[in-house]
């Protein structure tokens, strides 16, 4: 798959660090139509079941209980919407929404539930006007994209959605193994290794600072030209 032409690059929103200064859960929506009004830029967060979406979001905002962490893979079946305010250099601020998409790829989820995931996820990615980008999470211990990951990236590309690839649970691997996984994933989507973000909810790796996830979100949600 060719790299997204709109993936975040170094620029004004990444010159110095950004951090989340306020976060709140807004709602769980059973459909795209039930989501809040699209008056804020939105970032979709996707990945396989138990990839660590909730843990990463909690670590990013510094609130352990903001997003519920389920020990049952495939349990999240709604669009969970969170609003974040980020503070950056020179007093700059961004308010955006992170939309946690249903996890996918877990065999134990009921078939009818799994079949319901695809229309919801695809409908959101295709139809949501406020959506700025897709952030796809991949477990460092898997080390590669699944077929479903690939399909989601291709679907996002077909609908001109910028994508950001984020490796979770990087603390579970040594430095050499992390580098190998990063290069492998970068090669699989045709980007430079530096454009694949290494993160850990446990240690805070890759969340703050000029090259962290908070800065990437700020860059993706820069105000559009008038």
What are these regions (language model features)?
Residues 20-33, 172-226:
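Canonical P-loop GTPase G-domain recognition
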Residues 35, 75-81, 91-96, 102-132, ...:
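Switch II of P-loop NTPase G domains
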Residues 39, 65, 78, 94, ...:
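Helical mechanochemical/support elements of P-loop NTPase systems and associated helical scaffolds
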Residues 118-194:
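Conserved C-terminal guanine-recognition region of P-loop GTPase G domains, centered on the G4
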């Amino acid at each position: 798959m060719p790299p997204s032409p709109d993936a975040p690059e170094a620029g004004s929103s990444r010159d110095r660090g950004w951090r989340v200064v306020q976060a709140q859960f807004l709602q769980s929506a059973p459909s795209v139509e039930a989501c809040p009004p699209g008056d804020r830029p939105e970032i979709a967060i996707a990945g396989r079941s138990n990839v660590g979406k909730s843990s990463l979001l909690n670590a990013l905002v510094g609130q352990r209980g903001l997003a519920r962490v389920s020990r049952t893979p495939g349990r999240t079946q709604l669009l969970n919407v969170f609003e974040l305010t980020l503070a950056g250099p020179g007093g700059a601020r961004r308010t955006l929404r992170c939309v946690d998409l249903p996890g996918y790829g877990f065999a134990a989820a009921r078939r009818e539930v799994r079949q319901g995931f695809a229309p919801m996820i695809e409908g959101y990615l295709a139809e949501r006007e406020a959506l700025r980008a897709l952030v796809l999470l991949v477990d460092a211990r898997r080390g590669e994209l699944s077929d479903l990951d690939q399909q989601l990236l291709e679907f996002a590309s077909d609908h001109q959605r910028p994508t950001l690839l984020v490796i979770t649970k990087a603390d579970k691997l040594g430095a050499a193994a992390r580098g190998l996984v990063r290069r492998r994933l970068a090669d699989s989507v045709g980007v430079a290794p530096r454009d694949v973000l290494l993160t850990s909810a446990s240690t805070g790796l890759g969340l703050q600072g000029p090259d962290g996830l908070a800065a990437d979100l700020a860059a993706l949600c820069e105000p559009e030209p008038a």
